[in-house]
């Protein structure tokens, strides 16, 4: 009986491969690699919380939060990390609000960044789909879902009702995109805003625009919030930011991390390293002082962060020791640094 089942299945597999091509169906054990390849986010703490060393390749990722919370900054860091690993990226600026000077300060290679400011939601998503199907991109960012205005709404009169148009547009686009992303190994990052539902008595009134499709299709959803200001004396130099991973299909969800976003600089690698280093016992904190072994690296968090920025050899030594404490070998370390090959 078992032999008959095996023969019947082999016949079915052969028929599927003749019709749809070799590799259209296979046993999971036959795949060369089952590890989820990733692109670093620029924050060591967030990479670890995501469980695979960053945002997964070949998947849809949603970053949402209030205004000025760091959504675009996080997306630009992912682009910078993809480029640093030798990859290509695109930024579709539906809001028409990208600051190239800030993007360059974060580390984005503007010379090799593909950039578009589309006229409508349909145009933006068609451009994204064409780029993804080329198979050449590592990451594409759409900023933002709320700004993907359907053509009918643009051409209509102010005040006209267009109920459900954007939700239908997103649903159709994501159905097309999801398969192309998986085949190409491209990560699609959708930035989204927050809206409030009227008349909600219990639970959170907050929701994201664009319908339910993005919530279903996204493998990772990150809620990013500004939770405090970073000061140097009386001057505010950055924001303390919290990210909650509200959905994760590739690792356990609901993890929360905090990191620093410095004005004009982006996510502070050194600040993130301090947090993870203390957590892993590599860096010692006594009162206001931070120390690495016998060496004091600063009094106060900002001074310790500056010390690590000015002494890259000590920063790299601490990073290596943190990886060792976490039990990460060379291959996993490459993934955390955003240099893993995409799984096609």
From Swiss-Prot:
Domain of life of the source: Bacteria
GO biological process: DNA recombination; DNA repair; SOS response
SMART domains linked: AAA
Keywords: ATP-binding, Cytoplasm, DNA damage, DNA recombination, DNA repair, DNA-binding, Nucleotide-binding, SOS response
Binding site for ATP: 65-72
GO CC annotation: cytosol
Keyword DNA repair: yes
Record's subcellular location: Cytoplasm
GO molecular function, one term: ATP-dependent DNA damage sensor activity
SUPFAM superfamilies in the cross-refs: P-loop containing nucleoside triphosphate hydrolases, RecA protein, C-terminal domain
Transmembrane segments: none
Protein role: Can catalyze the hydrolysis of ATP in the presence of single-stranded DNA, the ATP-dependent uptake of single-stranded DNA by duplex DNA, and the ATP-dependent hybridization of homologous single-stranded DNAs. It interacts with LexA causing its activation and leading to its autocatalytic cleavage.
PANTHER family: MITOCHONDRIAL DNA REPAIR PROTEIN RECA HOMOLOG-RELATED (PTHR45900:SF1), RECA (PTHR45900)
UniProt family annotation: Belongs to the RecA family.
Official protein name in the record: Protein RecA
Gene giving rise to this polypeptide: recA
């Amino acid at each position: 009986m078992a032999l008959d089942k095996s023969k019947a299945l082999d016949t079915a597999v052969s028929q599927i491969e003749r019709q749809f091509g070799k590799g259209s169906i296979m046993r999971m054990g036959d795949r060369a690699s089952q590890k989820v390849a990733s692109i670093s986010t620029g924050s060591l703490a967030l990479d670890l919380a995501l469980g695979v060393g960053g945002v997964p390749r070949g998947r849809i990722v949603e970053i949402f939060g209030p205004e000025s919370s760091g959504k675009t900054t996080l997306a630009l860091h992912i682009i910078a990390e993809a480029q640093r690993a030798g990859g290509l990226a695109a930024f579709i600026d539906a809001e028409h609000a990208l600051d190239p000077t800030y993007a360059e300060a974060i580390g984005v290679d503007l010379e090799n960044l593909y950039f578009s400011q589309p006229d409508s939601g349909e145009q933006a998503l068609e451009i994204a789909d064409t780029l993804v199907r080329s198979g050449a991109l590592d990451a594409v960012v759409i900023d933002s879902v709320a700004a993907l205005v359907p053509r009918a709404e643009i051409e209509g009169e102010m005040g006209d009702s267009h109920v459900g148009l954007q939700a239908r547009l997103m649903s159709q686009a994501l159905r097309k995109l999801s398969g192309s992303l998986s085949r190409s190994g491209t990560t699609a990052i959708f930035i989204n805003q927050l809206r409030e539902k009227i008349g909600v008595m219990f639970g959170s009134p907050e929701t994201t625009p664009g319908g339910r499709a993005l919530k279903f299709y996204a493998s990772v959803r990150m809620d990013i919030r500004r939770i405090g200001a970073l000061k140097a004396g009386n001057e505010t130099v950055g924001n303390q930011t919290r990210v909650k991973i509200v959905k994760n299909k590739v690792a356990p969800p609901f993890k929360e991390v905090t990191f620093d976003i410095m004005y004009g600089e982006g996510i502070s690698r050194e600040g993130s390293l301090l947090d993870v280093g203390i957590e892993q016992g590599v860096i010692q904190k006594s009162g206001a002082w931070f120390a690495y072994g016998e060496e004091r690296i600063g009094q106060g968090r900002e001074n310790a962060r500056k010390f690590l920025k000015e002494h890259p050899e000590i920063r790299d030594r601490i990073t290596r020791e943190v990886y060792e404490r976490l039990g990460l070998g060379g291959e996993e370390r490459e993934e955390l640094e955003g240099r893993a090959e995409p799984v096609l």
